[in-house]
Amino acid sequence: MDTLTHALSGALLARATEPKRPRPDQLPRRTRMWIGFIAAAFPDSDFVTRFIDPLTYLTTHRGITHSVIMLPLWTALLALLFTLLVRGKYSWRAFVGVAALGIGIHIAGDVITAFGTMIFAPFSDWRAQFPTTFIIDPYFTAIIVGGLIASSLWNGTRRPAVIGLAVLVAYVGFQAVLHQRALTMGEAYAANHHLDARQVQAIPQPF
């Protein structure tokens, strides 16, 4: 999935999980959403390997920075970095939760695309994938943007952000139904034409 959509999803999740009455030691809304935005974009920092070699990028992209095993380490490092950037105004603990959520939703967003994500790196290069969504999905992005706009208009409650996330989950669920139907059709086609298909796959397409 594109990095901007990842980042926006992190901001929406940060808003949806904001405490109703933040304590003085907790992040204010604007800061919290920016941290969610940045943290959700972080896993794609592996793009720097593109400057080493295109093949290296293809083989390592969605690797160690997208690993659920490494997520605690990346969360801690980001929390420390954010603490330094605000010059200790907030403890690193204030950043941990939203940073973890941001990285987590990025990983989830990549798992639902076809390229696959090495969620167990560096111990395994197996790529998890549940390919329901095209890598750039305007509808997916629009739902997130709609949730953020609604949250800014009705800023007294986190309900619009929660609803936005619920609609997003429902949309992916609908795509999953379509994906399963496509697999069923592919299997039926292979059987009817006496094709020895070892595996049938359905790859999502734009629109």
Segments predicted by a language model, with ranges:
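Acidic/histidine-rich
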Residues: 207
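N-terminal membrane-targeting hydrophobic helices
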Residues: 1-184, 188-189, 193-204
